[in-house]
Curated annotation (Swiss-Prot):
One of its GO terms (biological process) is SRP-dependent cotranslational protein targeting to membrane, signal sequence recognition. SUPFAM superfamilies: SRP19 (SSF69695). GO terms for cellular component: signal recognition particle. This is Signal recognition particle 19 kDa protein. Belongs to the SRP19 family.
């Protein structure tokens, strides 16, 4: 797995993707960014990385990062290329994640 300790986000050509964005057990105020119908329970960083690779988003894994709203939870994050708006990118990932979980 390609892990990078530091990734520069300057230039806004990269997007931070936290597993919490796709977690069906979280409310919007707790950090979920996708609609409930596209969210899954306990999304894993490895799943998100795999999906981002398939979508050609050039994901970089940062396992040592913690989602600010849940600083005690060390699930890590992904840094992906920005090909669309952040919302559209998250929806693309969420749709593929939902398909993967349902198959």
């Amino acid at each position: 797995m390609a892990e990078t300790p530091t990734v520069k986000l300057k230039g806004k050509d990269r997007i931070v993707v936290w597993p919490a964005y796709f977690d069906a057990d979280r409310s919007r105020s707790e950090g979920r960014k996708v609609p409930k119908r596209l969210a899954v329970r306990n999304p894993r960083l490895t799943e998100l990385r795999h999906i981002a690779e398939k979508l050609g988003l050039n994901p970089k894994v940062q396992r040592d990062k913690r989602y600010p709203k849940r600083w005690w939870d060390d699930k890590g994050r992904l840094i992906v290329d920005k090909v669309e708006s952040k919302r559209k990118t998250l929806l693309m990932i969420a749709e593929k994640l939902k398909e993967r979980r349902e198959s």
